[in-house]
């Protein structure tokens, strides 16, 4: 079971519009904040267990975010905390663990996602190195109950260390509180064999990070402790669209039935 949650939570994604400093920013930050709040409220209304914000619209991404990105996300996170009662998570693309923890600390968020906590990933941003040491040092300086959810073989990347070694290093040496297993790209389904292996080898919760939908949730249910859902709950199942409240409610209703089994 994931700390702070009941049985097998659904974590809904709020994919933020392009933020100040990013290539596609449209020069209206207030609208971005309002949109994020509305998306988070949809997730709460639908019955999701948590919300996670991510600077999804900022492509092309930097390895670590600019200060204006961190400041913008802090404002958005604070606004959501004031309007929505669900646990809140922070993910800063491409791999800004320090920025994410810093925001979570000051706004009293509940968890962060780190794309590369341990090891090395070869990505469209170049070579990304793990941030476990830097994050552990910051956590020592600023103690909190913030949990670290870390990807193993994060999507949109190539990996030259085998999955099993990466998994064990992320937990044993990177000190992840939970691991995230995803498909190869946003919205792509996860390899169930990897979920099975993760459940076998580590004692921390295993979360599905991509590709969960109404049709496969029942199958995935037995192999995971939680689900991060973004693409499927959007209008027409497209990640760049806004959340479709009916799709969101539909998958929550199914999850609630599965929780009773």
From Swiss-Prot:
Pfam families: BtpA. It comes from Methanocaldococcus jannaschii (strain ATCC 43067 / DSM 2661 / JAL-1 / JCM 10045 / NBRC 100440). InterPro entries: BtpA, RibuloseP-bd_barrel. Belongs to the BtpA family. This is Uncharacterized protein MJ1115.
